[in-house]
Amino acid sequence: MTRHGKNSTAASVYTYHERRRDAKASGYGTLHARLGADSIKEFHCCSLTLQPCRNPVISPTGYIFDREAILENILAQKKAYAKKLKEYEKQVAEESAAAKIAEGQAETFTKRTQFSAIESTPSRTGAVATPRPEVGSLKRQGGVMSTEIAAKVKAHGEEGVMSNMKGDKSTSLPSFWIPELNPTAVATKLEKPSSKVLCPVSGKPIKLKELLEVKFTPMPGTETAAHRKFLCPVTRDELTNTTRCAYLKKSKSVVKYDVVEKLIKGDGIDPINGEPMSEDDIIELQRGGTGYSATNETKAKLIRPQLELQ
């Protein structure tokens, strides 16, 4: 009875299971995956490494990074920009050189045409030039002119049509045997790269001086634990992935957002060091992940080329 498993793909219908299996192996089709809790970072972890930060910093959009990881990312972006800029400058130099060559060839062709016109001008007065055949006529040199054939061609369709194709393709004649007449792929032109450094998560421009140091308040007894816990320095409540938190620029601390709404917005003073604050001195932290679809986006999608079956 083990032979039934060997013939699982012998059906005449391309099943859904076979399509999914072939899509994973062939590199075609969009892939979907359900992310678990281990694939989603916590609120105090780095957004790049998904690991606890040794030297945490925060971006203007509220994402937490490890200083070492974000510096390596910024350096990699600058190296990629320098590489793309060299390729773009090389393309511009090649285009300018090709334009100069084409201009020189056009000038040479113009001079040759003018010289040929001067040489073909009759020097004797009364000389008669040989008449040239009309363009598009069906007159054979040295033969008999047939006006009936030309009338039939005009009656059947447009002049200059080389095939039964319509539109612009009707006047073109591609040939498999002649390389010059075969359609070729045109090389895509490179656009000038942008020198802006972007945040790897939000995609917005970011500067190194905009990254601010973060001081989390650890919960007593968890300083040396594998999974450290942190609390709000004002309310002394535990901060979790579902807690709405805010970063205070004056004291570099992370507090619950209830502190901002109930204390800071009314008094305009940092409750930790007593310095005056404004709304620009408050950054809302991006929340961490819980692994539940009701709270976070737990589905990942990878878009790849689609496999078309005839």
Curated annotation (Swiss-Prot):
Entry keyword annotation includes Methyltransferase: no
PANTHER family assigned to the protein according to its UniProt record, in alphabetical order: ENOS INTERACTING PROTEIN, NITRIC OXIDE SYNTHASE-INTERACTING PROTEIN
Cell compartment(s), UniProt: Cytoplasm; Nucleus
InterPro entries, A to Z: NOSIP (IPR016818), Znf-NOSIP (IPR031790), Znf_RING/FYVE/PHD (IPR013083)
Xref: CDD domains: RING-Ubox1_NOSIP (cd16661), RING-Ubox2_NOSIP (cd16662)
The keyword Cytoplasm belongs to this UniProt entry's keyword annotation: yes
GO molecular function: ubiquitin protein ligase activity
Pfam families: zf-NOSIP
Gene3D superfamilies: Zinc/RING finger domain, C3HC4 (zinc finger)
Region (Disordered): 115-141
Biased composition (Polar residues): 115-124
Protein known as: Nitric oxide synthase-interacting protein homolog
Organism per entry: Caenorhabditis elegans
Family: Belongs to the NOSIP family.
GO cellular component terms, semicolon-separated: cytoplasm; nucleus
Task of the protein: Negatively regulates nitric oxide production by inducing nitric oxide synthase translocation to actin cytoskeleton and inhibiting its enzymatic activity.
Keywords, ordered alphabetically: Cytoplasm, Nucleus
